[in-house]
Amino acid sequence: MKTLLLTLVVVTMVCMDLGYTTICYNHLSRTPETTEICPDSWYFCYKISLADGNDVRIKRGCTFTCPELRPTGKYVYCCRRDKCNQ
């Protein structure tokens, strides 16, 4: 009986996780905060600081894998919780 109950708990936890989607901020640095629901299997939120001359812009969104820092970037922040890229 304990084995059956444990099996049901494990199956329930696995099934509940299958439908989970991540929510990330997707606004640029000077625009109002907006969010997006990430596509299936896109579990990461990112925040990139981009240098554009003397101006620094921040870009946010969902991603499948964490982006790499490009020559024009200052930093990349990648996380895996809802709205963690503020």
Curated annotation (Swiss-Prot):
Species per Swiss-Prot/TrEMBL record: Naja atra (Chinese cobra)
Pfam family membership, one: Toxin_cobra-type
Subcellular location field: Secreted
Alphabetic keyword roster: Disulfide bond, G-protein coupled acetylcholine receptor impairing toxin, G-protein coupled receptor impairing toxin, Neurotoxin, Postsynaptic neurotoxin, Secreted, Signal, Toxin
Coiled-coil annotated spans: none
Cysteine-cysteine disulfides: 24-45, 38-62, 66-78, 79-84
Keyword Phosphoprotein: no
GO terms, molecular function: toxin activity
Endpoints of the signal sequence: 1-21
Function: Antagonist of muscle and neuronal nicotinic acetylcholine receptors (nAChR) with highest affinity for neuronal alpha-7/CHRNA7 nAChRs.
Protein name: Neurotoxin homolog NL1
Cellular component aspect of the GO annotation: extracellular region
Stated family: Belongs to the three-finger toxin family. Short-chain subfamily. Orphan group VIII (haditoxin) sub-subfamily.
Subunit-structure text: Homodimer; non-covalently linked.
Tissue: Expressed by the venom gland.
